[in-house]
């Protein structure tokens, strides 16, 4: 079957097939090479891109902005105070207006339904920059980083440590299953992934041959791992749960002891950032004062170690987002994948 990207939205990882995701990862590597060599790639010349942000961001905003400019497009940032999604104006009406003015729309916010409505009613490609359920553009950056380090994806083992119910755990479990990557969720039972997410991932794993594991046993989780991945213990909007999460997730911290348990000297560490690995922020100092914790989901030792690839990963947000925008909006000759 012929598969084309033009005009399509990217709202969740399951929107694209395995072959399409692999194509986008390889296309990202190509665009990264062009960028490094200073070769222009203005595939979106004259296009206007709306960047809608209900949730604040450093990497997603910077990546979409620089990617759009590199592609020759004009990005327009609309923050939480600039848009009325569901407040004074329905998401449907907002989508219809923005679709008349912009060629593509990025949305970063809380509700998956909102990004779906934007895609349904705008008439232009919509890209999910993060919702409470999924983080698809992050996945392309993550698996590009993994492929850069190992030269392949299929058969590798990635372990996610921490809150197994958040959007990162959802996305890693499903995307890994699609791509044939073995995914293990190392989490307390109280925070195991939702059953519907697990069932979805298992359905993809049957096709790809990926092996999935959800466990609270450290030895079982990390043995032979190629990638250890973690994220913040408290997601945006859940700040009231801080004390509970610190107590619950302390045993799931990524530290050198956990890395050594993996028994793989070529292991890499990933984090989607921001990371609470020290107290060099106002937030970090506040956490230390309230809970007596100087390091949270990852120790400073690991974060600054030779295993760490989180800044390569952050850079790759730009290259992978560029690939998605170019493929879905650039009228490129991609007849099938």
Curated annotation (Swiss-Prot):
It is an enzyme of class 2 (transferase). PROSITE patterns: CARBAMOYLTRANSFERASE. One of its GO terms (molecular function) is amino acid binding. It catalyses: carbamoyl phosphate + L-ornithine = L-citrulline + phosphate + H(+). One of its GO terms (cellular component) is cytoplasm. GO terms for biological process: arginine biosynthetic process via ornithine; arginine catabolic process to ornithine; citrulline biosynthetic process. Its main location: cytoplasm. L-ornithine binds at residues 167, 231, 235-236. It is found in: Cytoplasm. Signal peptide: none annotated. Its EC number is 2.1.3.3. Carbamoyl phosphate binds at residues 57-60, 84, 108, 135-138, 272-273, 317. Pathway: Amino-acid degradation; L-arginine degradation via ADI pathway; carbamoyl phosphate from L-arginine: step 2/2. Keywords: Arginine metabolism, Cytoplasm, Transferase. HAMAP family: OTCase. Reversibly catalyzes the transfer of the carbamoyl group from carbamoyl phosphate (CP) to the N(epsilon) atom of ornithine (ORN) to produce L-citrulline. Belongs to the aspartate/ornithine carbamoyltransferase superfamily. OTCase family. NCBIfam families: orni_carb_tr, PRK00779.1. This is Ornithine carbamoyltransferase, catabolic. It comes from Streptococcus ratti.
């Amino acid at each position: 079957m012929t598969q084309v990207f033009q005009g399509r939205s990217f709202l969740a990882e399951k929107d694209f097939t395995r072959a399409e995701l692999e194509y986008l990862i390889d296309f990202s590597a190509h665009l990264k090479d062009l960028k490094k060599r200073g070769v222009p790639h203005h595939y979106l010349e004259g296009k206007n891109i709306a960047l809608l942000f209900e949730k604040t961001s450093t990497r997603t905003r910077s990546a979409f902005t620089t990617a759009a400019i590199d592609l020759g497009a004009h990005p327009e940032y609309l923050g939480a105070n600039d848009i009325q999604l569901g407040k004074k104006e329905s998401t449907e009406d907002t989508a219809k207006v923005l679709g008349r003015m912009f060629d593509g729309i990025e949305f970063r916010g809380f509700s998956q339904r909102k990004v779906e409505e934007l895609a349904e009613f705008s008439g232009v490609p919509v890209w999910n920059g993060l919702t409470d359920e999924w983080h698809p553009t992050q996945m392309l950056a993550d698996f590009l980083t993994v492929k850069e380090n190992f030269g392949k994806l299929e058969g590798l083992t990635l372990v996610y440590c921490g809150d197994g119910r958040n959007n990162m755990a959802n996305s890693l479990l499903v995307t890994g299953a699609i791509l044939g990557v073995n995914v293990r969720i190392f989490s307390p039972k109280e925070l195991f992934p939702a059953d519907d997410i697990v069932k979805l991932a298992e359905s993809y794993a049957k096709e790809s041959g990926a092996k999935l594991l959800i466990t609270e046993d450290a030895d079982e989780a990390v043995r032979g791992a190629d990638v250890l991945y973690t994220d913040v213990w408290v997601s945006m909007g859940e700040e009231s749960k801080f004390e509970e999460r610190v107590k619950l997730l302390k045993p799931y911290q990524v530290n050198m002891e956990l890395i050594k348990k993996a028994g793989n000297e070529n292991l890499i560490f990933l984090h989607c950032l921001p990371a609470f690995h020290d107290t060099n922020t106002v937030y970090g100092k506040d956490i230390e004062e309230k809970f007596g914790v100087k390091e949270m989901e990852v120790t400073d030792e690991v974060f600054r170690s030779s295993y760490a690839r989180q800044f390569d990963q952050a850079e790759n947000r730009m290259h992978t987002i560029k690939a998605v925008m170019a493929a879905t909006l650039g009228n490129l000759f991609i007849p099938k994948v």
